[in-house]
A protein has these predicted regions:
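Short, solvent-exposed amphipathic alpha-helical segments in soluble enzyme
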Residues: 209-213, 237, 299-301
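C-terminal "exit" segments of structured domains
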Residues: 285-310
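An amphipathic, basic-hydrophobic helix/alpha-beta surface used to engage anionic
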Residues: 1-154, 191-196, 201-203, 207-211, ...
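C-terminal or mid-to-C-terminal helical accessory/interaction module adjacent to the motor/catalytic core
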Residues: 254-265, 269-281
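Acidic, Ser/Thr-rich peripheral helices and adjacent loops at domain boundaries
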Residues: 233-259
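Short, electropositive alpha-helical surface patch
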Residues: 147-162, 300-301
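Von Willebrand factor
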Residues: 156-190, 202-204, 225-226, 230
Length: 310
């Protein structure tokens, strides 16, 4: 792979505010059972086994292991049935972070979308590793840039953070190619969290998500958008420049705002539909919102969806 661009000075540090870390730890405890093992120490697998947790019964058929007969149920119903179990497994969560040029907005010294994506990824890695699950990282622009394989060791957090802070946003985006290559790199199904502004054709995103879903990955899309992009607060005559394309536009922002907001909402609706149609969790991440509020909102929505699914 090509060398990653580095941010000026390369001494930028990424840390979690202790107060935020404490609230995130609380989220771990409250979301354990509801988020399909994302933050849990006990996880369920569709692979049947004899360890851990009793799930349900099914009718006995010749050849079944008699040790699994449910004699209490037989006494009540006069029917032979077999206890079914689910294995506890170690979850692998792959954090896929967009490091393309558009993630470098804004360019005026305020924290960028990429900075915010790094904080989200760091918080999720912290939570996953705290539960002794595997955390992996993949950075991308138009291709997979750097991939750190999953590890369950708490010491794995440091190289994850280092990989995030050593990368500076740059390059164009190709989500279909990136997610397709990612599928080839993932050893087994797990949770894949895509953290990106999703700038690019919606059909390329849809194709990439379909390729992930075909491998039975549980996919989450955290759509990172800056407050300026969501609310278009400009009131003076600025020059708008494309972050990944050579495009410059001089317009009156007040006259443009209604059309911009309408176009933004239509685009977000298309993205949401592309995700929903493929069973993908979709959540907008506003960079102006506190980190723990962002994660709480997303996890709450995810818990509600899982509860509805039963």
């Amino acid at each position: 792979m090509a060398d990653s661009p580095r941010s000026p000075g390369a001494e930028r540090k990424l840390t979690l505010d202790p107060r935020v870390a404490e609230r995130l730890q609380h989220l771990t405890l409250t979301a354990t059972r509801a988020v399909e093992g994302f933050l849990a120490g006990r996880h369920k697998s569709p692979h049947r086994g004899v360890s851990v947790e009793f799930v349900e019964r099914r009718g006995y058929v010749p050849g079944d292991d008699l040790r699994h007969l449910d004699w209490k149920a037989f006494a009540r119903t006069d029917r032979l049935s077999i206890k079914r179990y689910e294995e506890e497994t170690t979850l692998e969560c792959t954090l896929v972070v967009d490091a393309s040029a558009s993630m470098g907005y804004p360019t005026d010294g305020r924290p960028t979308k990429y900075d915010h994506a790094c904080q989200v990824a760091a918080a999720l890695a912290h939570l996953v590793l705290a539960e002794r699950d595997g955390a992996a990282l993949a950075l991308f622009d138009h291709q997979l840039d750097r991939v750190l394989p999953a590890s369950t060791s708490p010491a794995h957090l440091l190289p994850l953070l280092q990989a995030l802070v050593e990368r500076a946003p740059g390059g164009t985006t190709d989500l279909n190619t990136v997610l397709g290559r990612l599928v080839e790199r993932l050893p087994r199904p797990g949770i894949v969290v895509v953290i990106s502004d999703l700038f690019g054709p919606v059909d390329t995103l849809a194709s990439g998500l379909s390729r992930l879903g075909a491998r039975t990955h549980d996919v989450v899309v955290l759509h990172v958008l800056h407050g300026d992009e969501l609310r278009f607060p400009f009131d003076r005559l600025p020059r708008f420049e494309g972050m990944e394309e050579e495009l410059r536009l001089l317009v009156d922002p007040r006259s443009l705002r209604p059309d911009y907001i309408a176009a933004l909402e239509e685009w977000r609706s298309q993205v949401r539909r592309a995700c929903t149609a493929r069973g993908v969790d979709y959540h907008v991440v506003d960079t102006t919102a506190p980190l723990d509020v962002v994660l709480s909102a997303w996890l709450g929505a995810r818990m509600a969806r899982l509860a509805r699914r039963g």
